[in-house]
Design a protein with these regions (language model features):
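Generic low-polarity alpha-helical segments
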Residues: 1-3, 138
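Structural signal for the C-terminal ends of transmembrane alpha-helices
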Residues: 3-10
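Acidic/His-rich structured neighborhood in mature extracellular/periplasmic domains
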Residues: 21-22
């Protein structure tokens, strides 16, 4: 999605998108891992932790972000993510790593994670901007950072 932003067709700027994806990934990891280790479903190939499919959840998370960002400006791009995510889900079934219910639940968790991120991010971002008496949100930039040694937050404030 970030590469497509260069064409200027996105709904939100890249900083907002980065924050939305990071929040959605956090929701997704928390939900899928909690369920995966609580349920303990055995995989079709005998391995542990089948339900839900984390690969499918991540694939549909990406597809749903693309849909939310590009559905109004570039529908082909918006819907193509779902085709790729469906391919990932089918590959998990084909490779005998998941049951059908696993990939359906994974798709649901991925989409739900994005919806939760979009519901929570903007009110929080706007409240922070109002709290520090800013008229717009372009003076404050907060973005997650990742490295092999850990993660953190990047904070930039124009004054």
């Amino acid at each position: 999605a970030f590469v497509c932003d260069l064409m200027g067709k996105e709904k939100h700027n890249w900083v907002d998108q980065l924050c939305l994806v990071a929040i959605a990934e956090g929701f997704n990891a928390a939900m899928t891992r909690t369920v995966k280790y609580t349920v303990g479903e055995i995989r079709p190939d005998g391995g542990p932790h089948s339900f839900p499919s984390g690969h499918t959840a991540n694939a549909f998370l990406g597809a749903h972000v693309a849909w939310k960002e590009f559905k109004d400006s570039c529908p082909v791009l918006a819907y193509s993510g779902y085709a790729l995510a469906t391919f990932v889900a089918c590959s998990r079934l084909y490779n005998n790593r998941h049951w059908v219910a696993d990939v359906i639940a994974g798709a649901g968790f991925g989409i739900l994670s994005v919806e939760l991120a979009y519901l929570t991010y903007f009110p929080i971002r706007n409240a922070i901007a109002r709290k520090i008496n800013m008229k717009g949100n372009d003076r404050l930039v907060v973005a997650p950072t990742f490295s092999p040694d850990g993660g953190g937050l990047y904070l930039s404030w124009k004054f």
